Amino acid sequence: MQKKLLSILVLICTTLATNAQYTSLNAHSHNDYEQKQPFYLAYNAHFGSIEADIWAVDGELYVAHNKSEISAERTLEMLYLKPISVLYKQNKGKAWGDSPDTFQLLIDLKTAVEPTLTLLTEKLKKYPELFDPSINKNAVRIVITGNRPNPSKFKDYPGFVFFDGNISQKYDASQLVRVGLYSENLANFTKWRGMESIPEKEELRLRHIIDSVHGIGKRIRFWNAPDTEASWKILMKLKVDFINTDHIPELANFLKTNQQ
């Protein structure tokens, strides 16, 4: 088990170290469900990460930013799980028929961990060919953010479910395997708002955080980051793995014309 874990970490570190090119796979669709075409706009732009907020209400999982915005037709299954299933069938078990690439679905739990996470895993288990990498190597990666269980409870959930990490949290080796990503609030580390250069001291602090996360074979994104071209350039310079955006076409076009 230890050898297998070490091999996985080495492989991920190697991938991170060699992935110098930024593409749309480095793009994250923030609050994707608020787009005019939830899921499809980011998917068609070949985004590597898509975010959905969920609420558990009366045994169903609804997608919304606020509870007051819940509507009967906007369930996780209708907006994301079923469309993904249709595409995987069309593409013979892959996200995109002409590519081996896949993406992650970052699911933000807005209601309490339980029963929300159990309801979610029950729904995901209906689609093992979509989300379980032991069944399909091209599976969509599920990462849980928002309300999360204590790391000691990670093991209580299916192995295909990963969790958003926090740099202030300590994880043992078995828990770290279940950390699929680190997400941090950029405002906690810098007052920079995307227009001017980052102060050198704050840039060094960010680089240290990013390098530390990469050093354990994980990826990182910053939420609450300025959503501008100037900001995107700085985030690429810092080697942030996923660039947050609410502006899918603009970031997709930017990444095509500003590859590093």
Enumerate the language-model features and the residues they cover.
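Phosphate-group recognition and catalysis centered on beta-loop-alpha active-site segments
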Residues: 20-260
